[in-house]
UniProtKB/Swiss-Prot annotation:
Taxonomic lineage: Eukaryota, Fungi, Dikarya, Ascomycota, Saccharomycotina
Protein's cellular compartments: Mitochondrion
Family of this protein: Belongs to the mitochondrion-specific ribosomal protein mS29 family.
Organism: Saccharomyces cerevisiae (strain ATCC 204508 / S288c)
Gene: RSM23
Transit peptide (first-last residue): 1-14
Protein name: Small ribosomal subunit protein mS29
Protein function: Component of the mitochondrial ribosome (mitoribosome), a dedicated translation machinery responsible for the synthesis of mitochondrial genome-encoded proteins, including at least some of the essential transmembrane subunits of the mitochondrial respiratory chain. The mitoribosomes are attached to the mitochondrial inner membrane and translation products are cotranslationally integrated into the membrane. mS29 binds GTP and is probably an active GTPase. GTP hydrolysis may be linked to subunit association.
Keyword RNA-binding (UniProt): no
GO biological process: mitochondrial translation
Length: 450
């Protein structure tokens, strides 16, 4: 009995003694106790990478896009793209006019992954089966609503830029949404507009309105008079203190004045609606509404934005999503009969069954989830009678024309020029490009060596 009590006592003493030994020593007087830091001559935080003229501090695509590499490109005299005289430039590499370049740059028609830095300015090949065929359909088709399809890298964005150039020459007003992901990815400010009953994105709308203003001819915008009066709060820092509101009169002001309004963010949704309303009711000037990377919309029924219940916001509850689909479906109609709507899908986006069902290529599967199929989008596309135009691959004659231009631009390697017969080189590059894919053709020429 005594031995058992002693063992318990000793165990208790050992337990309490162990706790006292493990306890940290009190901090010296005048110092606060904290976590110990490892003494090291090297800081735990890596220093910022030093940016020098020769360093690669961006990824490859952004570096080549912004490094001004086109300044060292070989200047070549090329014919100018002109649809009215397209027979003279068929199957030839052409450049754009200065007016076209200015508009297309503002519209965002040229993308980073197109290797435009290899040449002084972006160029294109005028193709019989793509450029000429599509623009002829655009002019003659009774319902001018098209969706451009094709495999990745086949030239869908290039064809869309050629349509933009045609619109510039034919004096049309162009509205282009180059990256729908920018209003779907949840990275813009947004708020709910009680009057519109939609979620608006003020900063995105500000950039889009500026794009429309800068990309189009001021004389065209000025020629369209307003159909009614408007009043917006004034956010112009120059005179906002003495002029709290901007008033536009239908007898004095034009669409150019409407696009130039500087208003507060909460009113920007109403400003965008007013712009679309004015462009749709007028019949003087044709409107070309285009969307590149439209496959992002078709595969993103729910945006990355969330409402007050922490639920993802449906794409058609965003002002931009509804505005776009209203134009496509015909809910918003442009009064001018020459107006058109052109969509283009992208190979960088995932695919689902929405577009094939809308085009009648496959039947509806009632058991598929909304991740793979969005019935509302199918309904709107079919309501708008959207016609598919599939961009074909290059034929050998077009590959020959492109490689000849690349040779003149000093893009070809010396081993390709001197070590092979020209016919063998064409056959080889045609095969390496996947039987005529323009992007893969250029990759096989410029990215095939170390």
């Amino acid at each position: 009995m005594l031995r058992m009590s002693t063992s318990r006592f000793i165990g208790q003493r050992l337990f309490t003694t162990a706790r006292s030994l493990q306890a940290a020593k009190p901090a010296p007087k005048g110092k606060t106790q904290g976590f110990s830091k490892k003494s090291s001559s090297v800081s735990s935080y890596s220093s910022a990478k030093r940016v020098t003229p020769g360093s690669l501090y961006k990824n490859w695509t952004n570096t080549t896009h912004t490094a001004q590499l086109q300044q060292t490109a070989v200047p070549l005299a090329l014919p100018i793209f002109n649809f009215d005289d397209i027979s003279k430039t068929l199957n030839k590499v052409v450049s754009y006019s200065n007016k076209q370049y200015k508009s297309l740059h503002h519209l965002g028609s040229f993308k980073k992954s197109q290797f435009n830095e290899l040449f002084q300015k972006p160029v294109c090949l005028v193709r019989e089966d793509a450029t000429n065929s599509f623009l002829k359909k655009l002019v003659s088709h009774p319902v001018k609503k098209f969706i451009i399809t094709g495999e990745p890298g086949v030239g869908k964005t290039v064809l869309l830029s050629q349509a933009h150039a045609y619109a510039v020459d034919s004096k049309q007003i162009i509205i282009n949404i180059s990256y729908p992901e920018l209003f779907l990815n949840g990275r813009n400010d947004f708020s709910y507009d009680d009057d519109l009953k939609l979620f608006i994105q003020p900063m995105y709308l500000k950039k889009l309105i500026r794009k429309i203003l800068k990309a189009n001819d001021p004389a065209l915008l000025k020629s369209i008079e307003l159909s009614k009066d408007y009043k917006f709060s004034n956010a112009n820092p120059k005179n906002a203190s003495v002029k709290p509101f901007v008033t536009l009169n239908k007898t004095k002001n034009t669409v150019l004045d409407l696009l130039s309004v500087m208003t507060h963010p909460h009113n920007r949704g109403k400003l965008m609606k007013a712009i679309i309303d004015e462009l749709s009711v007028q019949s003087k000037v044709p409107i070309m509404f285009t969307v590149d990377n439209f496959s992002k919309v078709l595969t993103t029924a729910y945006s990355a934005y969330r409402n007050t219940e922490n639920k993802q916001i449906y794409s058609l509850d965003l002002q931009m999503g509804k505005l776009m689909m209203d134009i496509i479906s015909g809910e918003t109609k442009f009064a001018n009969g020459e107006s058109s709507t052109i969509l283009a899908i992208s190979g960088v986006d995932r695919t689902n069954k929405t577009l094939p069902v809308a085009l009648g290529k496959i039947p509806v599967d009632p058991y598929v989830t909304r991740y793979h199929y969005e019935p509302k989008f199918v309904e709107l596309l079919q309501k708008g009678n959207v016609t598919e135009f599939e961009v074909p691959k290059l034929n050998k004659q077009e590959v020959n024309e492109l490689i000849d231009y690349y040779k003149q631009s000093n893009v070809l390697l010396d081993k390709d020029i001197t070590g092979k017969k020209w016919e063998n080189l064409i056959d080889e590059k045609y095969f390496l490009s996947g039987n005529g894919n323009p992007r893969e053709l250029l990759k096989s020429l410029v990215l095939s060596h170390r």
